[in-house]
């Protein structure tokens, strides 16, 4: 009778076991890789969100070094006209990259055209004029409404495929604007953010397939980055900074007012990855419109499919803020981020004069220190209630998990009959307020 236990030598038997385990591991890993990433509502996330490939500006066409086309390497004169001529020349000749070399170049509002890109070399700086006259009034979008106001330092409208690259700096030169704002507030406490005339740093409207990578975006007089009615915009490894104190001698606690890092206004498919943000207001902010009839205004709109990941926050008012000028935000993810000193991590601003709906928001894998993690309160600043009976606003399907922050106040939530808070979970457990 054959002894079946000895059919295979022990070494061969061990080899079979190892091969079997190896193949099983490969199968399991393949299944894991085959599982597509999803948004909080279960819909599949497009592969575009996993593409962190940096843009090589040398592949984008002819390089237009600004100093080769009449721009002086002189930091004392405003050269808006000369710089704009280089941009327009590049556009007229089929597109290309406007290159800023080492040195400081003072300018007012610049307008990029289809096919043009901006590359700022290490040691190069575009510095904004501190005279508002260098920013001509036009129809633009600001604070949840389309109106006459000032453009940004860098502007693009209706462009497909633009980039801002390089290890250089776009400096808003905001000190005089900040001090003028706080001086106005000292005698008119009710003045709005727009009352003191200030430009933003960058403004993209009606754009798509845009990448902003590696640049330093600092000292904006107003919002730092504002994108409106745009899609498929990537912010990769940017440094975004405005001082949070020490800019106003009568009150040294004051910082750069309303210097939001990235304002996402009625946009879809936005990626913010690997960025550092330290500003004297909110960091990533979702906007879309305000007012009693905001949902009937075609210039407004929702924010959907917004991914913020692997970012580092210094001092900010809110890491991720929905509102106050927001209508409908859906499928929003904040993950794998660290905060040094955020006032709040997730801030849901409930504006009582605006119909709002925030849904399918996930915050996960957050570390560091914050004064408050989740903050939900009515927002009544500049209240503009109109003649309309509004239904309650709503926040639902808000998920928080694997949160490892130090904080004296994890949840600061104020219920109201003006909004409904539903389907909140923390590490999978239901929350009630």
Map each language-model feature to its residues:
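Short coil/turn motifs at beta-sheet boundaries
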Residues: 147, 195, 356, 391-393
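Right-handed parallel beta-helix
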Residues: 122-123, 160-169, 208-219, 231-245, ...
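Short charge-dense sequence patches
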Residues: 32-41, 186, 282, 310-318, ...
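Glycine-rich beta-solenoid repeat tracts in large extracellular/virion proteins
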Residues: 109-112, 125, 129-130, 152-157, ...
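Extracellular "leader-to-stem" segments immediately downstream of a signal peptide or signal-anchor
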Residues: 2-4, 11, 15, 19-20, ...
């Amino acid at each position: 009778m054959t002894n079946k236990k000895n059919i295979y030598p022990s070494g061969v038997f061990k080899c079979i076991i190892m091969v079997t385990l190896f193949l099983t591991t490969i199968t399991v890993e393949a299944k894991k890789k085959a599982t597509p990433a999803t948004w909080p509502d279960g819909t599949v996330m497009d592969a575009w969100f996993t593409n962190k490939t940096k843009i090589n500006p040398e592949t984008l066409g002819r390089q237009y070094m600004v100093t080769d086309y009449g721009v002086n390497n002189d930091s004392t004169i405003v050269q808006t006209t000369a710089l704009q001529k280089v941009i327009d020349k590049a556009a007229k000749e089929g597109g290309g990259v406007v290159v800023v070399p080492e040195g400081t170049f003072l300018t007012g509002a610049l307008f990029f055209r289809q096919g043009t890109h901006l590359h700022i070399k290490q040691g190069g700086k575009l510095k904004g004029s501190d005279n508002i006259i260098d920013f001509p009034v036009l129809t633009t979008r600001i604070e949840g409404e389309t109106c006459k106001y000032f453009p940004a330092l860098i502007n693009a409208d209706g462009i497909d495929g633009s980039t801002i690259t390089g290890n250089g700096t776009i400096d808003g030169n905001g000190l005089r604007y900040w001090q003028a704002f706080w001086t106005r507030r000292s005698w008119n406490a009710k003045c709005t953010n727009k009352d003191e005339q200030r430009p933003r740093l960058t403004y993209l409207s009606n754009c798509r397939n845009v990448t902003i990578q590696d640049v330093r975006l600092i000292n904006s007089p107003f919002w730092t980055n504002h994108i409106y009615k745009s899609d498929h915009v990537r912010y990769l490894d940017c440094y975004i900074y405005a001082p949070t104190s020490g800019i106003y001698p009568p009150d040294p606690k004051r910082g750069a007012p309303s210097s939001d890092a990235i304002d996402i206004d009625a946009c879809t498919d936005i990626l913010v990855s690997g960025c550092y943000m330290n500003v004297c207001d909110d960091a990533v902010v979702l906007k879309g419109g305000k007012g009693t009839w905001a949902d009937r205004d075609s210039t407004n709109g929702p924010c959907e499919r917004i991914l913020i990941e692997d970012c580092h926050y210094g001092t900010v008012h809110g890491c991720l803020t929905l509102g106050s000028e927001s209508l409908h935000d859906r499928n929003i993810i904040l993950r794998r981020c660290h905060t040094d000193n955020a006032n709040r991590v997730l801030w849901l601003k409930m504006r009582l004069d605006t119909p709002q709906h925030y849904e399918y928001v996930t915050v996960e894998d957050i570390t560091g220190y914050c004064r408050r993690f989740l903050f939900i309160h009515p927002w009544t600043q500049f209240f503009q209630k109109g003649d309309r009976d509004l239904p309650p606003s709503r926040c639902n399907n808000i998920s928080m998990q694997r949160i490892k922050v130090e904080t004296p106040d994890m949840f600061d939530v104020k219920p109201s009959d003006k909004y409904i808070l539903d389907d909140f979970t923390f590490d999978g457990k239901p929350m009630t307020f």
